[in-house]
Amino acid sequence: MAERVLTRVHRLRERVDATLCAHRNEILLFLSRIESHGKGILKPHELLAEFDAIRQDDKDKLNEHAFEELLKSTQEAIVLPPWVALAIRLRPGVWEYVRVNVNALVVEELSVPEYLQFKEELVDGASNGNFVLELDFEPFTASFPKPTLTKSIGNGVEFLNRHLSAKMFHDKESMAPLLEFLRAHHYKGKTMMLNDRIHNSNTLQNVLRKAEEYLIMLPPETPFFEFEHKFQEIGLEKGWGDTAERVLEMVCMLLDLLEAPDSCTLEKFLGRIPMVFNVVILSPHGYFAQENVLGYPDTGGQVVYILDQVPALEREMLKRIKEQGLDIIPRILIVTRLLPDAVGTTCGQRLEKVYGTEHSHILRVPFGTEKGIVRKWISRFEVWPYMETFIEDVAKEISAELQAKPDLIIGNYSEGNLAASLLAHKLGVTQCTIAHALEKTKYPDSDIYWKKFDEKYHFSSQFTADLIAMNHTDFIITSTFQEIAGSKDTVGQYESHMAFTMPGLYRVVHGINVFDPKFNIVSPGADINLYFPYSESEKRLTAFHPEIDELLYSDVENDEHLCVLKDRTKPILFTMARLDRVKNLTGLVEWYAKNPRLRGLVNLVVVGGDRRKESKDLEEQAEMKKMYELIETHNLNGQFRWISSQMNRVRNGELYRYIADTKGAFVQPAFYEAFGLTVVEAMTCGLPTFATNHGGPAEIIVHGKSGFHIDPYHGEQAADLLADFFEKCKKEPSHWETISTGGLKRIQEKYTWQIYSERLLTLAAVYGFWKHVSKLDRLEIRRYLEMFYALKYRKMAEAVPLAAE
């Protein structure tokens, strides 16, 4: 392995060397242009712009050695005259580093620590000390199996199953972990699967053969209780199935595994073992409630995701428990923060049943300090000093509520994942991580220049919490491949944590490996009760139409809607999101305002921000100010409608369909979107959708077939693409239908909550088994994380100011 990497590095250096030797003048001219920018960081588009600026014949000479291709793979250039260092991404998850002395035209290869040390000179100069704390998780995972192909990224469970089936069942001794695993299954004192009559693998195989012979003779629908006592006598307990047919399937699967193991059978068998009865889902920040909260600060897609996830998850748990022949009632607890100042929501209520479920609740636990309970909302960027005490309180609350340990803990976002890590560590429970969004990719250079951001965002605490959580967890769920490893041209959210530096704090030389089999892509869907095609007229919620009509077309301007639409015959271009910088709603308004063709074709309706009350969120305040300026500067009144955030999800579903009735379209213009739940919602309603090509929507939409990609950094082109679409629809009305139908088909194939919940519970089973068989291997990394948490993270969190009451 080491030899292959070394060879690749030399080839890369030799490639640059060859270009230098063959075309010294041309390369000197180009590098001089780069160097002339002075000390700093150049991004890919800046490097390519400089390359485009040189003469065509010089470009042609350099391209004899594929120099432009090399530049396209370069994610950043560090300029410290006379040196220029390049971070070159050969493919997702595979990086190399070189630097060139512009004066001497000498090329040097750099290791990860050398490159990061060079980069730190941008901040610290050359005096960054002889010893810097380096964080390196690679030694702890070196012995773990990992795939090497890009296509394997995000399919961790498939790789793990192949590895386990090959390694765990090759002789009698290797079957011992499975035997121990099956014997370890208990629930509140009740034994499941195997009892103490089965001592070794030989006994197990003999018992399974006897069971097979017996079950074959029974009618398939025979209930388990009719032969329960007979099975107990030979060592088999409840959990194999509810009927003779299902029990026989399980017995045969295990016999097949012991005889000739294969990955598909292993996954199916593990997925049917009774393992998950109590689930805790952590989502502390924002206003977490089921009504009247969407659009509040830090309250958006993540809340919707969890409230859609939980009913589907409960349904799948109930189905599996029944088919396992058990009479256990599952519980799901969504643990969030209790807000005494609940501002008209249920966020001050300790326990709240989740709509559409029987056994799932929101459990709220307050943040506390030595002075008592914290009453007011706190930004997600300022929660860090409260988390440790919060988790101590949460552990007591869930123990009292469940009367048992949870079987699976799911974290959401940075602080939820840190909380999940602390709780899973304390209880010894399988942990699942869902990032939703890793902030480091949203704010360019927020690692190297962390001090500029820290007073407002406290990224030093957040990035550290992210590193701890992603390395502590048993498995990670992402909605898209891009979330893990980006695309050919863009770096993935997790990939950006492979190597980075925060000067003065620590240097990450190996933070995460995107090839790690803990990564799995499991995409969510939209709630089919709320979001369904506009064409399903019998299901349409027409009672909302007068309200929606007033919302869109009323001549009244007030706190809920500003500006009016004069021409009701035009289609509506629609967007709905939080009003913050990254969501880029004001960017969309500016594109529209500056494109006369688009303004002539459609009305623009923006739902975002809450003008009904004064915002406490600084970003929202800035975006509101910008929106007012755009309306006035470009005289948008008459073609534009700005509606305050809408919190009624049922009505919002009909709003999408109402927009579809106008033959309009939905736009998601974010600078970055981890997944894009509103994209899925709009497409599920049959609304043609245009969405950012930075993040998840690039995978959800197949460009030109089920929607369109737009580049938020090139607003003029995005506006032209929108105008082209509506012009074509005007000439060919069937074009609108084609894109609408393409979007619906895409959703039905890939983005449903049923597929999601089945996959999640199977992952919990497989990684629960992996956790059992590799517990000794995981101990070292957990000790390392304990030390890093205690000595580094805790001090950073304590430095975050407590909120003023």
From Swiss-Prot:
Keywords: Glycosyltransferase, Transferase. It comes from the Eukaryota. Its EC number is 2.4.1.13. InterPro entries: Glyco_trans_1, Sucrose_synth_GT-B1, Sucrose_synthase_pln/cyn, SUS_EPBD, SUS_N. Residues 275-752 are annotated as: GT-B glycosyltransferase. One of its GO terms (biological process) is sucrose metabolic process. It catalyses: an NDP-alpha-D-glucose + D-fructose = a ribonucleoside 5'-diphosphate + sucrose + H(+). One of its GO terms (molecular function) is sucrose synthase activity. Sucrose-cleaving enzyme that provides UDP-glucose and fructose for various metabolic pathways. Belongs to the glycosyltransferase 1 family. Plant sucrose synthase subfamily. This is Sucrose synthase. It comes from Solanum lycopersicum (Tomato).
